[in-house]
């Protein structure tokens, strides 16, 4: 375990001499002041020529979408969604899919068309039957081998299988069938199809982040010289770049706020990851109307990240009890017995919520929203404290003890509650009551978050001397190997995705935009915790993701 002796002076000094503090040796901020150079960008104040060009392109795309025949419309909707501009045509897409759901037959259509229609309808909450795929099976209940000659259809079927729910054996068989054939054939294909297959096997459409997938699909789409729609392509490029400028301006504001807090100096043991936090929340919602929501949620996840390090790495149990009590009471009193750096953190935390309360008052939103958010944050730090007690008392919890705590300390119930605060009239009091009661979709998201995090991070955390993860708990309790645990956890993650899919089928308890936000949070985890802890170790794959979405524009 790496440790150091905290000196008796400076921002993190305490009244207790020579307390041994742990250090996780996180790498420093890799971005510096890079994002401070960007100016605030208001889309409504785009120059007149660009605004008119954008309007004309949008009207042309809308006309094509409305006038298209059924199958052409299917493919156009798919392209619009994958190019990241579906938010511009929500009413038209909803109307088209509603008509398709009413007349969904599919008996005479090919594999690609049926698979695509199924995927788009499921994606928008329509509970269409997976029995439509039985026509592609032989008398033995297996998918016909002749289908592999239709690679486009096989790829479309593969993408459709990721919308399966519990009990859909036909889609389980379809996933196995398509995956095996695509894996076998991928090295023999030419671009752009090869790139699509490789991308799909790594990250199916259903699990991808909007901005990353849009940037990638723009590059794929423009390679399809014979089939791509130049108007749609130009519109998607312009839309991406305009949104990127807006996002750069937002990140500049966030970076300036973070720099003024000066946590890098005042809390040097904590991860300095505010850019990564913004990227995380950009994956939750990217649309212009959610600017305030992004700003608030980015600040909250940044504060939660620092709290995680205070509880995991820095604080003594006595200090953490005092800090937790102060957060529970939500006041600045009785903090003299903890280090100055914790007091700095606590003041900054309260300021974030005060800022949000002022924003709610300014926009005429009810104040109860921030109350729900505060309660969710209190619940989070209670679980941080429970884990800190396990560590400092050298206690190895059972899996049954670990999971109820760890599913909350993973932060996704807290984030789900906070994500609603800035979402306007969509987030009713009933919606806050619903999310606060930890519904199935939030539980499933938390399972994916916790198990993914533990699988990629448990070895480093074990070396650091942290409390046992779900991996160690399972290995010890059931006497199995690490690889066997991974297999079991992947099954649980797969089942959690099915739970989430089920919760998004009509009729839903809350509106689809609120469910989509929770789904998007899970998509971020799927990306960042795929091969490693891409948040903590952000100087590899995550750096490339952020560069692609927030620095490099699309070439017009």
From Swiss-Prot:
Cofactor binding remark: Binds 3 Mg(2+) or Mn(2+) ions per subunit.
Enzyme class: lyase
InterPro entries: Isoprenoid_synthase_dom_sf, Terpene_cyclase-like_1_C, Terpene_cyclase_plant_C1, Terpene_synth_N, Terpene_synth_N_sf, Terpene_synthase-like, Terpene_synthase_metal-bd, Terpenoid_cyclase/PrenylTrfase
Residue interval(s) of motif DDXXD motif: 308-312
GO biological process, one term: diterpenoid biosynthetic process
Tissue-by-tissue expression: Expressed in stems and leaves and, at low levels, in rrots.
Pathway in which the depicted protein is active: Secondary metabolite biosynthesis; terpenoid biosynthesis
Superkingdom: Eukaryota
EC number: 4.2.3.133
Cofactor(s) this protein requires: Mg(2+); Mn(2+)
Catalysis performed (reactions): (2E,6E)-farnesyl diphosphate = alpha-copaene + diphosphate
One Pfam family, short name: Terpene_synth_C
Chain segments annotated as coiled-coil in the UniProt record: none
Residues given in the record as Mg(2+) 2 binding sites: 308, 312
GO molecular function terms listed in the Swiss-Prot or TrEMBL record: alpha-copaene synthase activity; magnesium ion binding; terpene synthase activity
Residues annotated to bind Mg(2+) 1: 308, 312
Annotated residues for binding of Mg(2+) 3: 453, 461
Keyword Lyase part of the UniProt annotation: yes
Domain statement: The Asp-Asp-Xaa-Xaa-Asp/Glu (DDXXD/E) motif is important for the catalytic activity, presumably through binding to Mg(2+).
Function, in words: Sesquiterpene synthase involved in the biosynthesis of volatile compounds. Mediates the conversion of (2E,6E)-farnesyl diphosphate (FPP) into alpha-copaene. Not active with geranyl diphosphate (GPP) as substrate.
Family affiliation: Belongs to the terpene synthase family. Tpsa subfamily.
Protein name, as recorded: Sesquiterpene synthase Cop
Taxonomic path: Eukaryota, Viridiplantae, Streptophyta, Embryophyta, Tracheophyta
Gene that produces this protein: COP
